[in-house]
Each structure stands twice: as structure tokens, then as C-alpha cells.
Amino acid sequence: MPSLPMTTRVSAYPSYILNMLALAGICVSLLVAFFFQLVLGEIPCPLCMLQRVGLMLVGLGFAMNVRFGPSATHYAIIILSAITGAGVSLRQVLLHIAPGDTGFGSAIFGYHMYTWGFIAFMATIIFSAFMLMVDRKHMAGSNQIIQTALGSVLIGFFLLLSLGNLTSDVLTCGLA
């Protein structure tokens, strides 16, 4: 009795791992933002909040890739969200590029968080475009989904962080 080939499942596994690592990177970014806000007392400015929303939307695309498998639609969500986040980050970088301007908030390794945000969004665009090219064979008709407990926990943690960020924004700005 012939068995079903497992090449799709096995060859899709590196993509699954890379998408999980990208989602973990988004979670770390949101945690660092929370640390600066809650522990160091640096209240985020409106542009910072928009960058966090961009991060959450990028994370949503990666979470969908982890949960449902790689998809061109998921990568499009990631790329469009990262372009928007990069635009907001670049706007903030350009606001503080004047001579003598010390920037907004604390610096991490010499760069402010909005500069790191721009770098991260641009890296996300490049990574997602590369994955979109590499994952084409897995997107065409592959309906096998790799789901692990670690992936589910990571998605849950991301959703919890996103809810925390949205709650923080509502408490900071109000609903109106």
C-alpha cells in the first residue's frame, strides 16, 4: 500500500521555524516597548503608538503563517504593514534629525526606538519578500498545516501582548 509523501510537510518545516522566529522577534519588540513604558516610565508618543500598531499587524501576518501555513496573502499583510510602520518610523526619525536635537526617549545601543523600528520594519520587508519567493512551492495547493504546541503558545503570547498594547493605548489616549 503506497503511503502519502511527506515531502511537503518536511520541506515546509524550515519556513514554519522562520515564521515562528519572526513572530518571536515581534513579541520581543513589543515586550521591550512595554518595558520602556511600564518600568522606565517613558510614555509612548502618538507616532510610537502607531509603530506598535504596525508591529502588531506584522505579527498578525506571521501568526497567520504559523497557524495556517505560508500564504501570499499573509506575506502581503506583513509587507503592507511593515511599509506603513516604516513610513511612520521614518517620519519620526526625520522629525529629530535637526542639529542639536537629542531625540525622543532613551537610546538603545546609540539609536532611539523609532530608529530601531525603521530598521526592523525594513528588515521585515526584505525577509518577507525573500520568503515569498522561497515559499512559492509550499503555497501552491499545499493544505498540510504544521502545528506545534510551541507555535500555539507563541501565537497566544503574541495575542496577549497585542491586547495589552491596545489596552495601554486606550488608557493613555481614551476612546475619543
Describe the function of each predicted region:
Residues 61-68:
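Short cysteine/histidine-rich metal-coordination sites, predominantly Zn2+-binding motifs
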Residues 51-52:
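Regulatory, intrinsically disordered low-complexity regions in eukaryotic nuclear proteins
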Residues 45-48:
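Short cysteine clusters
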